[in-house]
Amino acid sequence: MALVGIVLLGAGVYGIFALMRDDTPSPSAAVEEYLDAWAAGDHDAMAALVVDPPDDFAERHQAVVDELQVEDAAYELDSVDTGGSTGVARYTATLELAGAGTWSYRGSLALTRPDDGDEWLVDWAPSSIHPALADDDHRLVRTSEWPERAPILAADGRPLSEGRPARLIGIEPQAVTDLDGLKAAFQATLGIDPAEIDAKLGAPGVEPHHFVPVTTVDVPTYNAIEDVVYPLPGTRFRDTTLRGGPTPDFAAHVIGTFGEITAERLEELGEPYGPGDLVGLSGLEAAYERQLAGTPTVTVEVVDGGGEVVEELERFEGEEPQPLQTTIDLDVQAAVESAVADATAPTAVVVVDTEGNVRAAASRPIGEFNRAFGGEYPPGSTFMIVSATALLDHGVTPDTPVECTETVDAGGRRFRNFERSSLGTVPFGLAFAQSCNTAFISAAADLSPDDLVAAAERFGFNTEYSLGLRTVGGSYPRPDGVTEQAASVIGQGRVTASPLHMATVGAAVLDGTWEPPVLLPEREVDDAPEPTSIGEGVPEVLRGLMRRVVTEGSGTAAAVPGADVAGKTGTAEWGSGDPPPTHAWFVGLRGDLSVAVIVEGGVAGGEVAAPVAGRVLAALPD
């Protein structure tokens, strides 16, 4: 009997514990599971916790993620209230929106416990995603509005590049009724290939309700075609701006280009940029995109089925753009543009003042790379400015007799003058004025390689610097042997320089100090090179030598009547051939400005580059 009693007692205890333990699923646990699946983007797991989920359940949730650009999401259960077989769970959503910030809101989920089971399920409705989606045709949208782009400024504060009113023409796919007709009209009025429109409409991420940018035109162009394109079903229009200088080619390589973001640029910039945004594509517009653009104001809105805004739910204010100050002088730049307007060969011109400020730069052809800053060429006889400095250091004067023979042998290689000219025994000043290669090679034969390196480095050669754009300076490798030294004295061999650098060489002659060039005066530069003196008494002698080039030497085509202009011609051999092809150089001085000109494939500096420089010099102040 005792044993039976124990068994019965055990059964009684089990019954008590069974009554105390409630195996009914907790509504909080069900909601927590649903919210965790929502945060993870597991729509199948969410749907399994919903009573009668709609067929487009997953698509609706994913559309919110895609439209709002949700990078991360968290959903926290705040409370659960139940009564009988129904209840309400309240939650807080925290969404990280790419390129915007954190958006938090409070929402609720209706709960139900169906009659045929004990499990709590979500009684889903569109408002479960957000309370503002009570109407089935309402949806959440994200909009980005960029601030007006800041200007690029010239030295005096006037705009070098600024926006001009324009119209952005686009397409809303869902509103198009005749795509072929629309494409034909765009081709006829705007010259846009129908395949380009197909590519834009078919790009990844494009939704039927999106505004798909197609092209931007200035206001006069839009006014001329408005009657054709505006009535087309599906066309949409937005006010925007076009960027540029006073004329399309004005300082084009410095300013750069501005237009619709490319796939490569989008990958490079990342947030907060998206397809269709207008950005800098080259030059300063690209290099300083974030400064000039600021950041957009992002809004989260509720819109109805017709796309009309019902309510603004959140706003993230963007950052204001900041202007970019440059050293460009509008008047000097205009003179340079005029000088290269008719250029048929690749040409570059740079103007630098005695403080290293870049006052103007132009490169042609427009559609090719920036030769003014990024071109790397043998400087030819313009390098005689540097070689002359080394010779002056070692006692040569303008009156020192030198031998200007037709040819000279150096280490087994024969060097000659341009067009095989010769002057015989002449003063060094005349040899400089006439750009006599053989005289310089002979006179410099007693110099050591280190003498020439030291002179070159006083003019900034072998110094690294940058303007904030791709920049090439000057390179003077230590000559290896007699032949290479002879070539280097006349700016050949391995000696290279950009037009920018040769403009700084000329500027150093004006006041005796080489200054690293500056385009952006407010730009902070780590380890910027220090100014370098070119030597006591040297500038005065060099200016006199260069004055003779213009008055009686190889650079008379650069002369400006009544003006104190100086300069140095250069004819730089490159490539192969007999004779090899040449680039034409000229470095000119007037007032406190130095002008460097190169014409690729030019026959001779005095004949081709000097006239271009002369047109610039004529427009400069004394």
PLM features per residue range, with description:
Residues 22-23, 29, 33, 40-88:
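Short solvent-exposed beta->alpha transition segments
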Residues 303-313, 345-380, 389-601, 605:
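Beta-lactam-recognizing serine transpeptidase/beta-lactamase-like catalytic domain environment
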